[in-house]
Amino acid sequence: MDKENGKSISRRDFFKIVGAAGVVTAGLVGCNEQSKSSSNVIGEPDGDMTYRILTGDRVSLLGYGCMRWPMMSNPDGEGQIVDQEEVNRLVDYALAHGINYFDTAPPYCQGLSEEATGIALSRHPRDSYFIATKMSNHRLYGAGLRGKELQEASVKMYQDSFKYLRTDYFDYYLFHILGTGKGMEEMRGRLYDCGIADFILKEKEAGRIRKLGFSFHGDVRVFDYMLQESGIPWDFVQIQLNYLDWRHASGINVNAEYLYSELAKRNIPAVIMEPLLGGRLSKVHDHIVNKLKQREPEQSVASWAFRFAGSFPNVLTVLSGMTYMEHLQDNLCTYSPLHPLSDDEFVFLQETADLMVQYQTIPCNDCKYCMPCPYGIDIPAILLHYNKCINEGNMPRDGHDENYHKARQAFLIGYDRSVPRLRQASHCIGCNQCSPDCPQGINIPKEMQRIDHFVEQLKQNLMHKL
């Protein structure tokens, strides 16, 4: 099945959809005047948070993705730790402004997210928030565990999540990142062959899991199987949806138009991940920024992506990994309340997406699933710097171009500032430990080799000599 499988949602159908979504929003739209000033200071939302009641729970349309908590240097001098004080501040602010859905997983923040999230949330009444976490046994499977050994390690992961999150039940629980790796074979090995699917279903019957779902990336056969043949009555499904992936999904991913439509026709609520593609849709090419700003000068670039994701009525919540307070405040303004896209705005974003695919960025969402690299390479930082230079027009291509010297200098200086030399692409040995964990299907060693070759050409000024 290709990425365009399934019926397309037409312009007329989308207008009907967002018209229905608009019924659930009320009050004024946007932030107060402070947020509109040229100083970029973001103010308080003018209205109340938009909520969806698709699972029986009153869930905030903006959900907190806990994959990108702020980090700080470890006082012991080894690596980084979560900045717990800042996490507490972000969580307190989010709860005070209507966010009640918090999504985490055992691998997030290099294994530190669940504990940090649990510490922050446990300071508040348990009935004031919903916790979502995951059975993330893909790395256990990738490490070679099978059968009973995989089951025991998976059960331990599940039990540890209760401890770290300081709770005795999960509101939402997911089988994590189904569809990646070896597709159907890996899904069967992770869920059925080791018996963990039966174990989790019994946990739901016992009440320790309130709602059960799965998150999907990759092989569409896995997605279709889980909906059509698994026999599990899914309460929700988490998919990657944004205005670029709607019809232009890259790598191993499937067009979001198909994924959403399949869930909607089965009345299975969708939880949205990567509405901003790990920040890529807020750091688009300057030409795209100008296009968006001409349309709505007072809206942030990111708000377009969040309005798109929230405008579909079968969306339960839209997750955002808000590392900084200004991101949290901006997104709160977008969803307090949501102003659904109009028909013309939907078409405008699709035209924008058509334009964006012309810029050949690497589809890295900075999820850090590829980290840590055993050889110390900062993979996300390398890929993000490369994309940043493309989006800012600082990509030196031709030595005869009048902007070549300026772009060359910007790329090389920025590379050394963004990535310490011992962590740059030149140190990649091609072990490929990283690629199987990438939900975007990036061939990371190939990209490291390509970027390293490109950097060496720039350093030796070879392009200018062509």
What kind of feature is each model-predicted range?
Residues 2-129, 168, 199, 205:
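N-terminal binding-site loop/beta-alpha segment at the start of enzyme catalytic domains
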Residues 44-46, 178-384, 388-409, 436, ...:
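Beta/alpha (TIM)-barrel catalytic core signal, keyed to glycine-rich beta->alpha loops juxtaposed to Asp/Glu
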Residues 80-94, 150-164, 220-227, 302-305:
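Short, acidic/polar
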Residues 351-366, 414-432:
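Immediate flanking context of iron-sulfur cluster ligation sites
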Residues 394-428, 460-466:
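Short Fe-S-cluster ligation motifs
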